[in-house]
Amino acid sequence: PTRVGASCVLVAIGIVPSTSLAESAGLDIDDGVLVDRAQRTSNPAIFAVGDAARHRTADGMLLRRHEHWESAMNHGRTAAAALLGVDLPKLGSSWFWSDRYGVHVEGVGSMLAPGRDVVRAVDGIPQVAFRVSDDNLLVGCAAIDDSHAVRAARRIIDRKIVVDDDALADPTISLKGKSFRTR
């Protein structure tokens, strides 16, 4: 074995979906196994769930894969409902979290959706970033060491509550307050 002295090591494994089985079955592949809202692949008798599943919307737009345990669980619930012929479950916005070097990072929704960024700083340090659509709906949130903000943002996103940029940016205004109730 070779030893290398280092004060810090960065391991960047990356996530590449294993799609060879799906590809050999003739399924549509593009950075994952392409599925519809019900988790059906291009072969309607085959479903795909979990990290390798990538949604294609009804209009053909490809969404990113959601590599998170909650997404895998929700994919299974959705596929089961489709197989049973019952209504598909209503699911919340996609969510993730990670702890890195003593920092807790969380995100919900999409920070890449069309719109503008609003930043909430505490003591001059940016802590929460929001993505707001042109029609003033919250569509994404990312936070450092503030899981309460992300949970509140998820509720706001899922309920399609119209938001105010100044209220989002103000750390003295609770995201659970009356400023953020459905109108």
Mark where each language-model region is.
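A generic structural signal for secondary-structure junctions
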Residues: 26-27, 84, 158
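Cysteine/selenocysteine-centered motifs that mediate thiol-based redox chemistry or coordinate metal-sulfur cofactors
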Residues: 162-183
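FAD-site-proximal beta/loop scaffold in flavoenzymes
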Residues: 2-78
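Short, positively charged
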Residues: 1, 13, 51, 108-113, ...
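Mid-to-C-terminal Rossmann-like scaffold of FAD/NAD(P)H-dependent oxidoreductases
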Residues: 52-148, 155
